[in-house]
């Protein structure tokens, strides 16, 4: 039996070993299809990262599909039922690295746009694609650089669907209409090294810092709101000492992370953290890394169109959630764009034997096409 257009393209993409930041020819496949539809293509290569920006039309509104061609490493090959870069169909599921995150989504986007343009060759507004090979990596030279380039020339995205695997049990059961912000602090507390038998001749930075860390961990940073849970504070890494049991350390390194809602700003978080550390009299320094601001699309044409499209396919409205980690949507939202995430079920992403239900790819294609119908048809 001949593969459907979306399954055939998904297989082609999965077969290319595009472990981040490699693209391995995935974008060329997409570009070839988009050129045939009349898209203007602009390649944007920054260091080791391959990106492209494609646009069809010059009018507003500008609707964009955003995604990434890179995938995480396959992990232990012995644990895969099938080779991770040899797309294989088993019992109605397409197996392979990137099947759900997010080469399946990319195939759905392309086929949906092909079908939409066939029905609406003179559609309203403009359609764009923003594709990167640097989403699974350090996200330095990917979407953020493309967004900076577009903003510098005042080419602003109005509405964007990011194809991240948002769904939990069935495709379209969850639409992500926002994400929390993320900021990390690398704290170094200074003390005086010494012998554990002579603590009066030393100053243990661990002992000094623990009460402050306990206070930070116990703090209610905010109460969240209708769209976001309360801001969370977590300590993922601690490091002190030489490894010897008889040496008081001279320094104590602590890494902590906030996932924060729209109730807080990164500057407010910094101010409150420094206030606690200062109150405990610590000799310290903090290096802050802001990974992304929170964003929220709580109303607007895009959200209404996506919800309607999902309802038409599933006969049930999706849940609107802001849970999970960060995504490239945070960079696009900086333009003032309406941004939502809609993609496959995320149960197997980043795992061995990653897979996606083939029927879900067909449904997702329909959801994308119906969204275009509502917005630009």
From Swiss-Prot:
Cofactor: Zn(2+); Co(2+)
Catalytic-site annotation from UniProt: 70, 135 (proton acceptor)
Amino acids binding Zn(2+) 1: 68, 101, 164
Keyword Hydrolase set for record: yes
Gene3D superfamilies the record matches: Zn peptidases
Pathway annotation: Amino-acid biosynthesis; L-lysine biosynthesis via DAP pathway; LL-2,6-diaminopimelate from (S)-tetrahydrodipicolinate (succinylase route): step 3/3
InterPro entries with a match to the protein in the record: ArgE/DapE_CS, Bact_exopeptidase_dim_dom, DapE_proteobac, Peptidase_M20, Peptidase_M20_dimer, Peptidase_M20A
Pfam families: M20_dimer, Peptidase_M20
GO annotation terms (biological process): diaminopimelate biosynthetic process; L-arginine biosynthetic process; lysine biosynthetic process via diaminopimelate
Cofactor binding note of this UniProt entry: Binds 2 Zn(2+) or Co(2+) ions per subunit.
Record carries keyword Hydrolase: yes
EC number, UniProt record: 3.5.1.18
UniProt entry keywords in alphabetical sequence: Amino-acid biosynthesis, Cobalt, Diaminopimelate biosynthesis, Hydrolase, Lysine biosynthesis, Metal-binding, Zinc
Catalytically driven reaction(s): N-succinyl-(2S,6S)-2,6-diaminopimelate + H2O = (2S,6S)-2,6-diaminopimelate + succinate
Single annotated GO MF: zinc ion binding
Catalytic class of the enzyme: hydrolase
UniProt binding sites for Zn(2+) 2: 101, 136, 350
Function: Catalyzes the hydrolysis of N-succinyl-L,L-diaminopimelic acid (SDAP), forming succinate and LL-2,6-diaminopimelate (DAP), an intermediate involved in the bacterial biosynthesis of lysine and meso-diaminopimelic acid, an essential component of bacterial cell walls.
Family: Belongs to the peptidase M20A family. DapE subfamily.
Oligomeric and partner information: Homodimer.
The protein's name: Succinyl-diaminopimelate desuccinylase
Species assigned in the record: Vibrio cholerae serotype O1 (strain ATCC 39541 / Classical Ogawa 395 / O395)
């Amino acid at each position: 039996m001949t593969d459907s257009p979306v399954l055939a393209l998904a297989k082609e993409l999965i077969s290319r070993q595009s472990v981040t930041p490699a693209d391995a020819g995935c974008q060329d496949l997409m570009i070839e299809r988009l050129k045939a539809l009349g898209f203007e293509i602009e390649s944007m290569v920054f260091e080791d990262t391959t990106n492209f920006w494609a646009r069809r039309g010059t009018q507003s509104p500008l609707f964009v599909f955003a995604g990434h061609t890179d995938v995480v490493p396959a992990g232990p090959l012995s644990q895969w039922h099938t080779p991770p870069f040899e797309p294989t169909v088993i019992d109605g599921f397409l197996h392979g690295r990137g099947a759900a995150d997010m080469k399946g989504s990319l195939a759905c986007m392309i086929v949906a746009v092909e079908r939409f343009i066939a029905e609406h060759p003179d559609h309203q507004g403009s359609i764009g694609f923003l594709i990167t090979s640097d989403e699974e990596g350090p996200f330095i030279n990917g979407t953020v650089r493309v967004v900076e380039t577009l903003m510098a020339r005042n080419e602003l995205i109005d509405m964007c669907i990011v194809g991240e695997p948002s769904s939990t049990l069935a495709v379209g059961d969850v639409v992500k209409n926002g994400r929390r912000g993320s900021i990390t602090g690398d704290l170094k507390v200074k003390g005086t090294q010494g012998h554990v038998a002579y603590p009066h001749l030393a100053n243990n930075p661990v002992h000094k810092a623990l009460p402050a860390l306990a206070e930070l961990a116990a703090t209610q940073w905010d109460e969240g709101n209708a769209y976001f849970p309360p801001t969370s504070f977590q300590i993922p890494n601690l490091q002190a000492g030489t490894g010897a049991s008889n040496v008081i350390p001279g320094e104590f390194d602590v890494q902590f992370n906030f996932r924060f809602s729209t109730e807080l700003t990164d500057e407010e978080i910094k101010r409150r953290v420094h206030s606690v550390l200062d109150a405990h009299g610590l000799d310290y320094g903090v290096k802050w890394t802001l990974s992304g601001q929170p964003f929220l699309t709580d109303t607007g044409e895009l959200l209404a169109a996506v919800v309607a499209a999902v309802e038409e396919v599933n006969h049930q409205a999706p849940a609107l959630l802001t849970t999970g980690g960060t995504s490239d949507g945070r960079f696009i939202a900086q333009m003032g764009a309406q941004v939502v995430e809609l993609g496959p079920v995320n149960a197997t992403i980043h795992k061995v034997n990653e897979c996606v239900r083939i029927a879900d790819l067909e449904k997702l294609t329909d959801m994308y096409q119906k969204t275009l119908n509502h917005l630009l048809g």
